[in-house]
Amino acid sequence: MNASDTQLERTTVTEGDSQGIDSTASGTQNTRPAVIVAVLAAAGITSSLTQTLVIPLVGELPKLFSADPSVTAWAVTVTLLTGAVGMPILGKLADTYGKRRMLLLALIPLVIGSMICAIAPNIAVMIVGRALQGIATGMVPLGISLLHDVLPPERVGTAIALMSSSMGIGGALGLPISAAIIQYVSWRGLFWVDFAIAALIFVLIYVLIPKPHHEHNYAPFDFVGALGLAVALLCLLLGIIKGSSWGWTSPSILGLFIGTVIIAVAWGFWELRFTNPLVDLRIIRRHNVLITNIASIFVGFAMYAQSLILPQLMELPSSTGYGLGQTMLQMGLWMAPSGFAMMAVSSLGAKITTKYGAKTTLISGALIMACGYGLAALVMHSLIGLTIASCIGSMGTGFAFGAMPTLIMNGVPASEKASSNSFNTVMRSIGTSVSSAVIAAILAGTSIAVKGTSIPSVTGFRMGLLAGCAVAIVAGIIAAFNRK
């Protein structure tokens, strides 16, 4: 083992270092493990809700704020960008200063951002609020890492799977809840509800989640690395998200992608030389960690494609001959069971991981996702059929999302768990961004004109579903290269 690897395996006791279990056991005596899991899962659901609550509102924002749709679209885009940038930074700070502390810190911009959105007088203020909300995306990987610290070992696997699946519940519930609030209360009420939930979660974490006994491993923060990664991710994701609207061969998009490569290379050189890097590339290149991160990109693609295609198919007018004519609220209710299905299989996924290993669970999850897409492509005319297909796909997602953090955390030192898990979530976010661009291109490229309006064709929907199926299979193949 060389000197750098020796340094990586240092045994300084940090929050999350698990000398671990003895110290955390006393920390959980006053709080039942089930309560800890419930509170952190609720935090994960809240984070996911924040991402989806605004979706039913996107089409109304141009009218509400008298703004161009290209401007109001930033209410969604900016959340993805700040979330991707914030996750690795929060993860590294959590490894240094404490996961519980950073989890509470991540909730503060969510509370403030929700309030700003609720009172926003114009779209610029709304975008600022949404940017702050996006930082809370890092709560899920932080919560997963914290579970590893404060729970007895025999409960960790199931708890991580449940925490991972909380994203599915939030995504599934977000659409019907937001549609109902907009329809029966007001769009501002949507953000006041988010404000209240986030504030409540802050109090619950502060009161109920124990502090692990530890010594802080204070170290100089890698500001240069944080800035470099932030700029590289912003260039990459902005190029992917805006490629179709700005033009894939436009100077702006090409400049963003070229800038991504240049900045990423320079960032990599810096990270390999800094004593306490934001992302330790020596750890990231370890076999199982590297393979899992690559697989995460494909899993993220496959997970998100379903939520892009099925709602549009359900909401298209039945007069098209293939649309199912559902309202936003009805569509949300048809999609809601998939979130519960994802959570329901979390314990089964944990049992498979315990008995056969996280590699098997990840492969199984990816192949189950592929089956869901295959079924959806066959039953596009049926609401019940699509609901069943979405449930199958979400079950596979639940398996995969529960397995990936386990593979990552089993392959890194205790002092790097939060930052490595956060980086894995960033890889998944890149996959969802690519999915958004690819599916949008497929649907736009096969669109047809109906009464002067361009809409996705049935061929486009089927091609999108088959693309999701193929990507899920690729994710399973990549996962198979993990070592036991």
Language-model segments: residues:
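Helix-breaking motifs and short loop linkers at transmembrane-helix boundaries and internal kinks
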Residues: L64-S66, G98, I119-A124, P152, ...
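12-transmembrane solute porter fold
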Residues: P33-T50, V54-I55, P69, A73-V78, ...
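Cytoplasmic helix-loop-helix junction between adjacent transmembrane helices
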Residues: L132-S165
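Conserved MFS/SLC helix-loop-helix module at the cytosolic interface between two early adjacent transmembrane helices
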Residues: V85-I123
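Paired small-residue
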Residues: P109, G113-I116, A124-L132, I384-I392
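Membrane-interface helix termini in secondary transporters
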Residues: E60, P88-K92, T96, A180, ...
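C-terminal membrane-cytosol helix-exit motif in multi-pass small-molecule transporters
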Residues: A196-H214, A230-K242, G259-R273, G476-N482
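Helix-loop-helix hairpin linking two adjacent transmembrane segments in secondary transporters
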Residues: I169-V203, F221-L229, L236-F257
